[in-house]
Amino acid sequence: MSGFGGRGVDEKGFLRWLLGELGVEEDDVAYVDGLVVKVDGAAASTSRLPFQTWADFGWRNVAAAYSDVRVKFAEARLLLASVTAPDLGTAAEVVQGVREASQFFSLAYVGGDLNEGRDVVVDVVLVGWARARVGRAPRPGDVLVTIPQFGYTSLAYRFWQMGGAVVERGVEALKRPKPLWPLPPAECVTAAMDSSDGLGDVLWSMARGVDIVVKELPAPREVLEFAAERGLDVGEIVFNGGEEFLPVFAVRRDCPVESPYVSFAEVVPGEGRVWWRGEELKWRGWAYFRGWG
């Protein structure tokens, strides 16, 4: 670890440093000889929600990896999973969720590993075919499009015990995420990311060498009304959610934006900043070893 200045660095800063050391492009997937490879994982002590079963937790980790592959226009085919658990009963429940997710997403579950430990940890590897190489650096003049369903998970984190239709939509999305959204025309897309650590994280990650100006909040009316009725900051709700597993695509301005997608931001020349309502966006999403920013 020589040369790594770890003080004050979070998960994303560490990974950026590591990829630089390895000479690998910073992205959410790896491209190797026409293949796409993705690894993703989580520990229950930091990532399992109180309303998730162990099977839900297994499913969630498959969905997280699948979302990163799908947003890159790649076709995931094979799945391997490593599970750590304190007992075989818990491990079996997690594996059941992994199996159910593999069937739902049409993945061949071909193997994995099992370990004993105090925490429950799930690591998923997906391998598939890469149709094209899609990075996450948009160009000036592009517009950002997404499916306007942000905010539900934010409300679920805060109000899951309260219930209600709006909150329940977020709870269900967090228990068994299903990132099977349609893809826009590939020839129109210049960059892509999915929102797992919050929309703010996506925007700051894409704003490298360019500025991003948010024009509209990509959230449904019922989410905005729910937040307003309770005096919540709608920016916090929309930008600092997480685990939406919704796609954000940078597309050429001359391409049509068709349902279920909406245009919500513009890419302009700049120095890597994100703007909302004339001010620099203060929300940066989630990162391990830092928390919400």
UniProtKB/Swiss-Prot annotation:
Catalytic EC class: transferase
For this protein, the activity regulation entry reads: Is inhibited by AMP; the mode of AMP inhibition is uncompetitive for both TMP and ATP.
Q: Which residues bind Mg(2+) 3?
A: 25, 68, 194
Q: Identify the keywords attached in UniProt to this record, alphabetized.
A: ATP-binding, Kinase, Magnesium, Metal-binding, Nucleotide-binding, Thiamine biosynthesis, Transferase
**How changing residue 136 to M affects the protein?**
7-fold decrease in affinity for ATP. 1.5-fold increase in activity
Question: Which reaction(s) does the protein catalyse, per the Swiss-Prot or TrEMBL entry?
Answer: thiamine phosphate + ATP = thiamine diphosphate + ADP
What Gene Ontology molecular function terms does this protein carry? Answer: ATP binding; magnesium ion binding; protein homodimerization activity; thiamine-phosphate kinase activity
**Entry note: thermal dependence:** Optimum temperature is 120 degrees Celsius. Activities at 100 and 80 degrees Celsius are about 50% and 10% of that at 120 degrees Celsius, respectively. Is unstable so that the protein loses about 45% of its activity after heating for 15 minutes at 100 degrees Celsius. However, the enzyme is not so intensively inactivated in the presence of ATP.
How does this polypeptide assemble, per the annotation?
Homodimer.
The name of this protein is Thiamine-monophosphate kinase
Which lineage ranks, top first, belong to the organism behind this chain? Archaea, Thermoproteota, Thermoprotei, Thermoproteales, Thermoproteaceae
